[in-house]
Amino acid sequence: MPRRAPAFPLSDIKAQMLFANNIKAQQASKRSFKEGAIETYEGLLSVDPRFLSFKNELSRYLTDHFPANVDEYGRVYGNGVRTNFFGMRHMNGFPMIPATWPLASNLKKRADADLADGPVSERDNLLFRAAVRLMFSDLEPVPLKIRKGSSTCIPYFSNDMGTKIEIAERALEKAEEAGNLMLQGKFDDAYQLHQMGGAYYVVYRAQSTDAITLDPKTGKFVSKDRMVADFEYAVTGGEQGSLFAASKDASRLKEQYGIDVPDGFFCERRRTAMGGPFALNAPIMAVAQPVRNKIYSKYAYTFHHTTRLNKEEKVKEWSLCVATDVSDHDTFWPGWLRDLICDELLNMGYAPWWVKLFETSLKLPVYVGAPAPEQGHTLLGDPSNPDLEVGLSSGQGATDLMGTLLMSITYLVMQLDHTAPHLNSRIKDMPSACRFLDSYWQGHEEIRQISKSDDAILGWTKGRALVGGHRLFEMLKEGKVNPSPYMKISYEHGGAFLGDILLYDSRREPGSAIFVGNINSMLNNQFSPEYGVQSGVRDRSKRKRPFPGLAWASMKDTYGACPIYSDVLEAIERCWWNAFGESYRAYREDMLKRDTLELSRYVASMARQAGLAELTPIDLEVLADPNKLQYKWTEADVSANIHEVLMHGVSVEKTERFLRSVMPR
């Protein structure tokens, strides 16, 4: 019989213990499947027939007049377009059904993909451990920054900043006691006394665009299939149950809601999002934030990418670059790497109680909300014995660093194996592995990378490895063999990196390539957003997009270098006029004025003031979409006064005491 993860319905005491006896927590425990139109712009719903007509006309016109310019190696040239413009043809607010149940174990998934269950050589073992040492040594304390509007999740589900600071400060004080309880196997005590442990809270977020093609033979639009797991498949890790394509058919909306859906529009893709228990995350974040500061400073060449010019200066030194694509990064993330990281942290002298907290955070059960109507509200795994292998949970306090550690070394191993075996002699033991990796991350070797977790471009200078680099590129293009033992890696068709397109000229050489904004993203962000503007929420800090109008001010800086930027704006203007009988430019200028005024009022209440003229394009991007502070920019990239608008935290004095208790003396 296959191993089954224990599962507990909400009626079971195991699940009930995860939710405090307050209104928000009890509502979260029973949160039902919800769908409905979002407010794309103030007063304009995503299902408005005029808006759908506009998206229909615009997506067809742009695809017809500006076809993708991508060569057989996935490199973008010419007009800077990497794919068609049909991605906006979604009924925003209405998801595919069902979403996936998260796998309780990814061991079979990795085995089926022929991925290794540990380092395949002593060299690789040394490199993974060297990465831990370089990232987690010589850390300097920083304030513990907490995102405004975020939830503490299990068990209290509070959004109040004062409450979050209280939880964080208490967690730093009690972390050692909780960690020692976990070392004794007393996970229930650690949770009941200090709320450290419990489970991840799984919700489903919309991915408001997805791949859509037009079949030239039938004239029908086709949306990319998204495979989802049913409950049985999830609890057995794929040993039983079903994996099948979710339905994106939007025709159901007519019968259910009376919405007329134009031909070729689809329901949105949905992905799992896991909120971590904040009391457990806070002690992890207090270490993770100094790690980020260190690698974004010392290893900025590899890990910190600000302006396009900054990225171009790195790439222009290369003779070859390859944009990579990684399949299912979070669900493939290996548990053996967690064990290796924890082992090496102990070798370094990290406090065992903190390492146990960290390890537990990567093995927690998951409470699944509502993947479909009449489904969910179930706890997978036992909080008394956390042992799931779900991969990398998006709500873990150092999730970005875990992705960075895995993928940076995975990319390096791939480069060494296929292009630079002559460098292996420099990796003999831990000191030499650390020296080599330090040099590599600083961009001093003939093989290089710029990366942020699974988003990366690999590079080769004019050294001996270049010939092998071209062979690897051919291997990736053919797609017959996975070049990595650790993750499924291919080349990216339409090379993009952190939202920008690497645009080649006729020479197809990195030295003459430039980064330009992804024009598809510009359109999707405006007309197929993940979240509505929530105009009914008076407190801007509680909105998903507090100042969406500001995106208009930064649009030219962000996307203006794309060769067809002006043509696209003209097409938008014409199609908008056809649908609404008014100017889109005037509409957005008015929206910008209103949000600029609201911003000045909001920031005036903070410690410092700022006018629009003082804000950088990055500030404007982050204010329009604060999520970019999590995946694209860092605290150092954003003006201090704007950071105060979005974040608050625990003083450096308190985090310093905590960090000193955790790190080697």
From Swiss-Prot:
Location of this chain's protein in the cell: Virion
Required co-factors: Mg(2+); Mn(2+)
Keywords for this protein: Magnesium, Manganese, Metal-binding, Nucleotide-binding, Nucleotidyltransferase, RNA-directed RNA polymerase, Transferase, Viral RNA replication, Virion
S-S bridge residues: none
Organism of derivation: Pseudomonas phage phi6 (Bacteriophage phi-6)
Signal peptide: none
Cellular component terms per the entry's GO annotation: virion component
Entry EC no(s): 2.7.7.48
Xref: SUPFAM superfamilies: DNA/RNA polymerases
Function recorded in the entry: Rna-dependent RNA polymerase part of the packaging complex that packages the viral RNA segments, replicate them into a double-stranded form and transcribe them.
Protein known as: RNA-directed RNA polymerase
Recorded catalytic activity of this chain's protein: RNA(n) + a ribonucleoside 5'-triphosphate = RNA(n+1) + diphosphate
Predominant cellular place of this UniProt entry's protein: virion
Annotated positions binding Mg(2+): 454, 491, 495
Any one GO biological process: DNA-templated transcription
MF annotations from Gene Ontology: metal ion binding; nucleotide binding; RNA binding; RNA uridylyltransferase activity; RNA-directed RNA polymerase activity
Subunit-level organization: Part of the packaging complex composed of RDRP, P4 and P7. Interacts with P7.
UniProt keyword Glycoprotein, yes or no: no
EC class of the enzyme, as a word: transferase
Residue ranges annotated for the RdRp catalytic domain, each copy included: 310-485
Domain of life of the source: Viruses
Residue ranges the record marks as coiled coil: none
